[in-house]
């Protein structure tokens, strides 16, 4: 039978599309809205590039490459998925963290959390990166960014455990079956997953290095010419 999306995912971000869909209640409206959301990522991408001193031509190239990346824009032709919000919102959050802009970082992080329950992982990783960077730099000017990042990290954990508990009690439960090769003692808890990684880290390394996953990593990095690995700051 039919099942509500909200029985398996917590995605209130979809309500941002509701006013437009109410005006034009057609499937094509959702496709156009998804394309607009994806395209909006060029705004924070442009601002991040400008913040780091890239020229106007370089900024245009960055934005063009983002829009032309097949894995990014290809889904607009046939599908609708809440993950379309992730890239623009995460770029806004990274911009907010980069510039220590509290309103931008907090609002974009909050909206990212409303995309899906596991979107908290993206917020947590970005916040953790910012915490480590601030600690390594150690300058007094980093205190504001450090506190902001620590707050977002705590919020991401609180949200994740809150919404997963909600899905377990009032929904169909969290879709944890994809991690079943990490579970033990007949447990399907995400806490068991974390425990398994700490108890046997080589299992996590092995799972990450399977041939098909290495191929996927090669395709991903190849399309980006390895640019994510070219940096002067490896924190």
Roles of regions detected by a PLM:
Residues 4, 11, 15-18, 23-43, ...:
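Loop-to-helix entry region of an early transmembrane alpha helix in multi-pass inner-membrane enzymes
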Residues 1, 149, 157, 163-203:
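Extracytoplasmic catalytic-loop and juxtamembrane helix elements of membrane-embedded
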Residues 33-39, 61-97, 111-123:
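Multi-pass, polyprenyl lipid-linked donor-dependent membrane glycosyltransferases
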Residues 122-157:
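Perimembrane helix-loop-helix junctions
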Residues 57, 92, 96-114, 143-151:
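Short hydrophobic alpha-helices at membrane interfaces in multi-pass membrane enzymes
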Residues 210, 214-235:
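Hydrophobic, aromatic-rich transmembrane alpha-helices
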Residues 52-53, 85, 91-104, 131-138:
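Membrane-interface transmembrane helices that cradle and orient dolichyl/undecaprenyl
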Residues 28, 36-68, 87-88, 102-107:
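Transmembrane-helix signature of polytopic, membrane-embedded enzymes
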């Amino acid at each position: 039978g039919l099942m509500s999306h909200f029985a398996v995912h917590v995605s209130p971000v979809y309500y941002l599309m509701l006013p437009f869909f109410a005006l034009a209640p057609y499937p094509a409206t959702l496709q156009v809205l998804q394309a607009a959301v994806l395209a909006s990522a060029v705004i924070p991408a442009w601002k991040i590039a400008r913040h780091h001193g890239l020229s106007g031509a370089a900024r245009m190239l960055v934005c063009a490459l983002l829009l032309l990346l097949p894995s990014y824009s290809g889904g607009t032709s046939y599908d609708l998925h809440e993950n379309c919000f992730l890239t623009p919102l995460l770029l806004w959050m990274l911009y907010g963290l980069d510039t220590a802009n509290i309103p931008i970082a907090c609002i974009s992080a909050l909206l990212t959390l409303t995309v899906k329950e596991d979107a908290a992982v993206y917020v947590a990783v970005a916040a953790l990166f910012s915490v480590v960077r601030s600690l390594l730099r150690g300058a007094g000017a980093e205190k504001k960014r450090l506190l902001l990042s620590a707050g977002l990290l705590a919020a991401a954990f609180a949200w994740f455990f809150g919404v997963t508990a909600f899905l377990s009690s009032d929904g169909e439960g969290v879709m944890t079956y994809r991690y079943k090769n990490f579970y033990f003692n007949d447990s399907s808890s995400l806490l068991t997953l974390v425990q398994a990684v700490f108890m046997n880290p080589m299992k996590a390394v092995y799972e990450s290095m399977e041939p098909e996953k290495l191929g996927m990593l090669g395709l991903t990095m190849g399309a980006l010419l390895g640019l994510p690995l070219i940096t002067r700051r490896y924190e």
